[in-house]
Structure formats: structure tokens, C-alpha cells
């Protein structure tokens, strides 16, 4: 991944690469750019807001994990805080294609798990597919969301998804990323399970009630969490495992370094992620133990 970032720097205009390199090559770079850093880059490069976001796309795409298609897509969302979050597409050998994560989903989930409660805009390499348009329509900020493509004028999400079907059509008022704190507790004293419960408590599952979360422990001791992101159209829903894998990817860590997993689900839910979670982790590393708890 670092070599891809270095390649992107080599291809970028000198004014951008000179000022961006200390940010993206820093040991603590977390695939985000603060509002202050973005402002400094604007001043240093004399690019417009739109031009700079588009110029940053190759750096987001550098995080892509696409062993099947070898087609690398980047996305950048701006959270309500003003911080930019990178995202990239993610595929898995030996697993059905339904487990694939699109760059837009990645960037949005990246922002969500880092505490954002909505996104203002998204910048992407290519026009969003119907799957991603529907995924974005679940967001708490869907009505205001703007989409920026290279060499195009900024357009609203609903320009790309007219007469949209969404949460309101099913009587749901709260969208994905809205600030929420469910009150699930678990008596297990396992620290990884408790991390999964924490993720569960911010999950979004108004259609199946399968509020759920996962925690993945790395060999290094780092723990990454994922919360379930359900969708009114069902199929674009993003399972908790994928949301956690996104955090691993954007942290520059490797999937083969996952040491253990813990999945926690609502016992009153109408579905379960257990089988798909086990099969996907099995494809990544058959030795990963999975703890499972219903609460």
C-alpha cells in the first residue's frame, strides 16, 4: 500500500506532492485528512476545493484490495466535522461476490466508525453504481449529499437516484450514521466480546432488528470494530464483518494478521450474520477463532 502511495505522489503535480507527502507518508497516517490540513493544501496548491479532492483520489485508491478484478477505485467523503476520509474497493478470493465492498461504502463506513454522524459530500473516480446510490440513500444526510466526479459538475445524490426508495417509505425516520446509542449489555467478561457489544450499540438495523457488531483482534493487539449497516433495499446492507475489515484496510494493516473475532447479535433479530462471517473469515485465514454471543 505504501508503494502505491509513493507511486501516486510521483504522478501528482509537484506542488501537491511536496505538501502532501509529509501527511500521507507519516507513520501515523490514518487515511484521513483534517479540515486544517485540507485548507493548507488548498493554499499551497492553488487548487479549488473540487480540484483538490479529485487530485486526492489516487491516494484513496492506493488502499484498494482488489485481487479479483485488479480494478482500483478510490472514494473520499467529507464528514460533518470537515475531515476527509479515504475509502477504496475491497474483494476477497474464494468468497461469493456479494461480500465485496465498494469504495463509496468503504469511505462512508470509515467515517462512521471514526465517529462521524453524517457526510456532506463524496468524491469518486467513477459514477456510482446503483448499489452504492441506494446505500447512500440510507444516510442521515442523504437529502443534502453531494457527489463529485472528475471533470463533472457536482450533483446531488437524488440527481443520480431520482424518485428514490428509502427508509421513509418503510416508516423509518432515523438514517445510517445518525447519532444513536442502543443499550445492549453482555455479561461475558471477554474484552473482545465487549468491544463487539460497543459496535453493536451504534449499529443500524431497523428492518430486521438484527442490531449487531463485531470486533477483530490483530496479532499486534490492535482491535478493529464493525457495526451492521442495514439498508431499506436489503441487498446493499453492509455486514459488520465488512465494516470492521474496512477499518483494517484503511489502517494499513493486513487481513492475514487477524488473530481472533467476536460477533454479537440481537437475539430478537430476524436474520444472522454468523454463517457468512465464518465463511468469509475462513477464506482469509481458516485458523481465526470466532466467538459468538446473542444478547
Curated annotation (Swiss-Prot):
InterPro entries linked: APOBEC/CMP_deaminase_Zn-bd, CMP_dCMP_dom, Cyd/dCyd_deaminase_Zn-bd, Cyt/Deoxycyt_deaminase, Cyt_deam_dimer, Cytidine_deaminase-like, Cytidine_deaminase_bacteria
Recorded family membership: Belongs to the cytidine and deoxycytidylate deaminase family.
Residues at the catalytic site: 104
Cofactor entry: Zn(2+)
GO molecular function: cytidine deaminase activity; identical protein binding; zinc ion binding
Pfam families in the cross-refs: dCMP_cyt_deam_1 (PF00383), dCMP_cyt_deam_2 (PF08211)
Species annotation: Vibrio campbellii (strain ATCC BAA-1116)
EC number: 3.5.4.5
GO cellular component: cytosol
Name used for this protein in its record: Cytidine deaminase
Keywords: Hydrolase, Metal-binding, Zinc
Cofactor note: Binds 1 zinc ion.
Catalytic activity: cytidine + H2O + H(+) = uridine + NH4(+); 2'-deoxycytidine + H2O + H(+) = 2'-deoxyuridine + NH4(+)
GO-annotated biological processes: cytidine deamination
Residue ranges occupied by any CMP/dCMP-type deaminase domain in the UniProt entry: 48-168, 187-295
PROSITE patterns: CYT_DCMP_DEAMINASES_1 (PS00903), CYT_DCMP_DEAMINASES_2 (PS51747)
NCBIfam families reported for this sequence: cyt_deam_dimer, PRK09027.1
EC class of the enzyme, as a word: hydrolase
Role: This enzyme scavenges exogenous and endogenous cytidine and 2'-deoxycytidine for UMP synthesis.
Amino acid at each position: 500500500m505504501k508503494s502505491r502511495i509513493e507511486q501516486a505522489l510521483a504522478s501528482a503535480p509537484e506542488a501537491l506532492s511536496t505538501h502532501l507527502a509529509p501527511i500521507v507518508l507519516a507513520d501515523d497516517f490514518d487515511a484521513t485528512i483534517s479540515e486544517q490540513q485540507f485548507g493548507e493544501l488548498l493554499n499551497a496548491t492553488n487548487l479549488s476545493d473540487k480540484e483538490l479532492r479529485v487530485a486526492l483520489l489516487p491516494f484513496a485508491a492506493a488502499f484498494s484490495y482488489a485481487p479479483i478484478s485488479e480494478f482500483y477505485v478510490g472514494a473520499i467523503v467529507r464528514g460533518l466535522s470537515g475531515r476527509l476520509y479515504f475509502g477504496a474497493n475491497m474483494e476477497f478470493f474464494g468468497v461469493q461476490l456479494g461480500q465485496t465492498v465498494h469504495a463509496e461504502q468503504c469511505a462512508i463506513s470509515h467515517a462512521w466508525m471514526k465517529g462521524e454522524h453524517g457526510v456532506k459530500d463524496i468524491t469518486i473516480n467513477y459514477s456510482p453504481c446503483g448499489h452504492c446510490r441506494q446505500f447512500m440513500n440510507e444516510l442521515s444526510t442523504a437529502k443534502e449529499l453531494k457527489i463529485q466526479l472528475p471533470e463533472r459538475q457536482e450533483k446531488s445524490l437524488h440527481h443520480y437516484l431520482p424518485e428514490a426508495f428509502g427508509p421513509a417509505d418503510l416508516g423509518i425516520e432515523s438514517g445510517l450514521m445518525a447519532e444513536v446509542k442502543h443499550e445492549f449489555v453482555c455479561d461475558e467478561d471477554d474484552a473482545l466480546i465487549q468491544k463487539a457489544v460497543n459496535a453493536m450499540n451504534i449499529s443500524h438495523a431497523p428492518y430486521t432488528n438484527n442490531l449487531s457488531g463485531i470486533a477483530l483482534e490483530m496479532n499486534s493487539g490492535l482491535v478493529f470494530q464493525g457495526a451492521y449497516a442495514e439498508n431499506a433495499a436489503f441487498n446493499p446492507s453492509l455486514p459488520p464483518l465488512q465494516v470492521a475489515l474496512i477499518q483494517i484496510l484503511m489502517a494499513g494493516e493486513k487481513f492475514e494478521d487477524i488473530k481472533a473475532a467476536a460477533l454479537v447479535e440481537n437475539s430478537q433479530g430476524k436474520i444472522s450474520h454468523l454463517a457468512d462471517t465464518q465463511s468469509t473469515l475462513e477464506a482469509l485465514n481458516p485458523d481465526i477463532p470466532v466467538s459468538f454471543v446473542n444478547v
